[in-house]
Structure formats: C-alpha cells, structure tokens
Amino acid sequence: MQPDSPARIPGQSPEPLSDELIDFASEVFDVARRGDAAMLDTLLHKGLPPNLRNDKGDTLVMLASYHGHADAVRVLLEHKADPDLRNDNGQTPIAGAAFKGYKPVIETLLAHGADVEGASPDGRTALMIAAMFNRVEMVEFLISKGANPDAKDANGFTARDAAAKMGAPDTAARLAQASEAKSRPPGV
C-alpha cells in the first residue's frame, strides 16, 4: 500500500482502488496536513467524504489537527466530519492537538462537539497528553472546558501522575491545584 493510501472510505465496500484514486487521496491528505482550508472546502463540496481515512486510520481532521490548522479543522467539521474519530492507534484529534500544543485547534474541535474526555484505548485523555509534555496553557484550558484532573488511565494513573513521571513539574503542580479545588466543597 502506498503511503497515505485510503484504507477506508466510509460507506463504501472495500474494493481495490485504482492507482489514480490512491494518488488523489494521497494529495488530499497532504492538503489537510498543509491546512489548505479553501481547497478542502472545494473538495468537500464536490463530494469528498469528510471522514476519509488513510492507511493508518488518520482522518483529515486528525491530520489537520496534528499539524495545527484550526481553519482546516473548522471547514472539515462544518462538512460533518466526526471530531472524535480515532486513528488505528486509538488517538483522537484533540489528543494530537494537545500533544503539539495547538490551543486554537482544540477550541475549534470542542466548539464542534469533540469530547474533552475522549480517551484512547489505554485510557489516556488529551489532558494527560498535555500534562506529560508540560503544556500548562493546554492543561488550564482543558480543565476550564471540563477535563477531569482526577481521571485515571487503564493503569490507574492520573494526568498529574503522568506529568510527574515525565518530569513535567509545572503541569503536575497545576493539576494538583485543580484536583484540590475540585475536591473542596462549594463555597470553601
């Protein structure tokens, strides 16, 4: 299979794809990576499936999110792309944006219904990913949007635990504050 060949086209049977279609799909994935919102809009209006996936299960939203292109993400979501589709590794677009530190992308995803608590199969959330890489602004923003600082992954670790394990003292401290504030009775 060629790099970025579409492994799956939603709603269609798995038929062999022509080399021409594979080359076209590869170009489309590059358009998402580059964040060319106008070209994506044109292609979507012409019938491009908004949830097109490559051979790794990455959607156009995932690729645009991971590369920090909020306008491209917005266009895809306005064409009914699913903001929570995971790739073959179980990663969500919001987790990819949190890893890279792209707050405008996360804002766009959340404004279009992405699950702030959407977890990968190992239970890791976007908050945990941001915490691991000491992205304080991301951690604060995700908490302000409802991310649970006390959520645990499949191994029983919280975002604070992940931050401490990765040597991310700033986010570990911020998460400790958030956890304490959450456990305090209202008005105290």
Name each region found by the language model:
Residues M1-V28, S144-K145, A154-F157, D161-V188:
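Ankyrin-repeat-protein effector appendages
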